From Swiss-Prot:
Belongs to the anhydro-N-acetylmuramic acid kinase family. Catalyzes the specific phosphorylation of 1,6-anhydro-N-acetylmuramic acid (anhMurNAc) with the simultaneous cleavage of the 1,6-anhydro ring, generating MurNAc-6-P. Is required for the utilization of anhMurNAc either imported from the medium or derived from its own cell wall murein, and thus plays a role in cell wall recycling. This is Anhydro-N-acetylmuramic acid kinase. Keywords: ATP-binding, Carbohydrate metabolism, Kinase, Nucleotide-binding, Transferase. ATP binds at G9, T10, S11, L12, D13, G14, I15, D16. It catalyses: 1,6-anhydro-N-acetyl-beta-muramate + ATP + H2O = N-acetyl-D-muramate 6-phosphate + ADP + H(+).
């Protein structure tokens, strides 16, 4: 099958689309990336997303409208990846659309219940592309008692499981998440969970203090010094003390967190603040390895992916934090995979599994009571 995986993450960089060819289904699937592209959001769309992400500024009218606007954006992005690949849209069998997360509350307080909301109307995508769409991947896992995240472990088992080596896959997107993939000869379980902020705080600080969308290659963070009192404040966040499985998002490490941090430590230089929040991402990752993984698994390789793997300063901080461990650290490109395309490929794989009615959550990662088939299916009109 030819499948387009569509991902719009917490970092709001744009719409990632991976065009892949998948043979078969299940853990024996063969997956080939044909083409990958990122379609940036128009400024007005990005501003509307940022508005609905804010509890203070959001409103139901805007969410309703944006749901359909994003459906059109996602459909346009699918057409773009096909155009760039010289691939006929009519040949496309399936689209897996993650959608844009508006709110995710796996462990809410008060009278709220565990829930999640992604928008980007699948009916609009199906109509515009004349292709079947799989969407809303997180909801069934949450209905089964899971946290709805992380969902990439199933695809990582297919793509990265090694005959003899135990691997850690660390994704560094807006949020960081890790998957432990034991070797094929091991009888240990796959586990996965969010490690805290990835690029989210770094990017927000860059935008506010330097008027830049992100710290390219970590060049600014390389110039500053870590401020111990800021790092201690960050590392005392309650999320780091929780046991896995667990997930997090903009609700805990978004604009409000950054506003409080900058107000509290405004006396420090902006370079030192950026260096310190970069170290926070690295330290939160290393903390979770040493606390929850390395005492129980003998890890041979750590593979870093996602946009954060292009931040050289962040990568070096992670290497330094793991310098006393026996594992070898790679970037995904070192082993022949694209860091940028990882999550889009994952949702293409999950769409293929749903199409074949195969469960594709990993209960040991999400905390769900059972394996379930993920997502909703939206068929195109008959023409």
């Amino acid at each position: 099958m030819y499948v387009a995986g569509v991902m719009s993450g917490t970092s709001l960089d744009g719409i990632d689309v991976a065009l892949v060819h998948i043979e078969g289904s299940g853990v024996g699937s063969k997956v080939e990336l044909i083409h990958f592209t990122t379609v940036p959001f128009r400024n007005d769309i990005k501003n509307e997303i940022q508005q609905v992400l804010s509890i203070k500024n959001s409103n139901v009218q805007l969410i309703c409208s944006l749901n359909f606007k994003l459906g059109l954006c996602f459909a346009k992005a699918v057409k773009e990846v096909c155009k760039e690949a010289n691939f006929s849209l009519e040949q496309l069998d399936l689209i897996g659309s993650h959608g844009q997360t508006i709110y995710h509350q796996p462990k809410p307080e008060g009278n709220m219940i565990s829930s999640t909301l992604q928008i980007g109307e699948p009916a609009v995508i199906a109509y515009e592309t004349n292709t079947t769409v799989i969407s809303n991947f997180r909801t069934m896992d949450m209905a089964a008692g899971g946290q709805g995240a992380p969902l990439v472990p199933y695809s990582e088992i297919i793509l990265y499981r090694h005959p003899t080596k135990n691997r850690l896959l660390q994704n560094i997107g807006g949020i960081g998440n890790v998957t432990v993939i034991p070797s094929q000869k091991s009888d240990q379980n796959v586990i996965a969970f969010d490690t805290g902020p990835g690029n989210m705080i770094i990017d927000e600080v860059c935008q506010r203090l330097f008027q830049l969308p992100y710290d390219q290659n970590g060049e600014i963070a390389e110039q500053g010094e870590v401020v111990d009192e800021i790092l201690t404040y960050c590392m005392n966040h309650s999320f780091l003390k929780m046991n896995p499985p667990k997930s997090t998002g903009r609700e805990q490490f978004g604009e409000e967190f950054v506003s409080q941090l900058l107000k509290r430590y405004e006396k420090h230089s902006k370079e030192n603040i950026l260096t310190t929040v970069t170290m926070f991402t690295a330290s939160s990752i290393v903390h979770h390895y040493k606390e929850f993984i390395l005492p129980y698994y003998e890890i041979d390789e750590v593979i870093l992916g996602g946009g954060g793997s292009y931040n050289d300063t962040l990568v070096e901080m992670i290497r330094y934090g793991l310098k006393d461990e026996k594992c070898t650290i790679f970037i995904q490109e070192d082993i022949g995979y694209s860091s940028e395309a990882k999550e889009a490929i994952a949702f293409a794989i999950l769409a293929n599994e749903t199409y074949h009615r195969n469960p594709s959550n990993v209960p040991s990662a999400t905390g769900a009571m059972q394996s379930v088939v993920l997502g909703n299916i939206t068929f195109p009109p008959i023409r």
